[in-house]
C-alpha cells in the first residue's frame, strides 16, 4: 500500500487475532470498537499502543481488566468528543490506581509508573462517543 522505504512502519488496521488473557477484560462490540493496536508482533521493535472508540449505550460495562502491574510505564487516556467543550468527557470513568478509586468525567491522561497496581477501569456512564488511547513502553501488553 505504501511505496516509501519506511512505509512498513505505518499501521492502518488493528492487530489481527489479538489474544487477550482472562485478566485483560473484553470489549463489547455493542459499546466499543478497537480501531488500532500496535506492539512488537505488528512491527518488530514497536512498543504497545491501543486505540478504542467507546459508544453511548445503556449497557453495563463488564469488560474491565483486573488489577495488574507492568514492568514499564503506561499512559491511559480518554478524550471527549464535544467540539464545544473538549474537556467534557461525555462519560464517567472509574479508574483504580494503587487501590485508590478515581472518578473522572473530563478528558484526561493518567500516567501509571512501572510496578504500580492499576485497574479495574470501568465506564460507569457514557452519553457521547469517547476516544481511548493507551501506550506503554513494553513490547507487548498481553
Listing of model-derived features with the role each one plays in the protein:
Residues 80-105:
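A short beta-strand-loop-beta hairpin characteristic of the jelly-roll/cupin
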Amino acid at each position: 500500500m505504501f511505496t516509501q522505504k519506511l512505509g512498513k512502519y505505518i499501521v492502518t488496521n488493528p492487530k489481527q487475532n489479538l489474544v487477550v488473557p482472562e485478566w485483560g477484560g473484553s470489549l463489547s462490540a455493542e459499546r466499543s470498537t478497537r480501531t488500532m493496536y500496535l506492539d512488537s508482533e505488528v512491527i518488530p521493535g514497536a512498543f504497545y499502543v491501543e486505540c478504542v472508540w467507546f459508544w453511548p449505550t445503556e449497557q453495563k460495562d463488564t469488560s474491565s481488566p483486573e488489577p495488574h502491574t507492568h514492568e514499564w510505564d503506561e499512559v491511559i487516556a480518554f478524550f471527549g468528543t464535544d467540539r464545544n467543550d473538549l474537556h467534557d468527557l461525555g462519560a464517567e470513568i472509574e479508574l483504580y490506581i494503587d487501590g485508590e478509586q478515581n472518578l473522572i468525567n473530563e478528558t484526561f491522561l493518567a500516567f501509571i509508573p512501572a510496578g504500580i497496581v492499576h485497574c479495574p477501569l470501568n465506564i460507569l456512564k457514557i452519553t457521547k462517543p469517547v476516544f481511548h488511547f493507551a501506550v506503554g513502553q513494553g513490547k507487548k501488553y498481553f
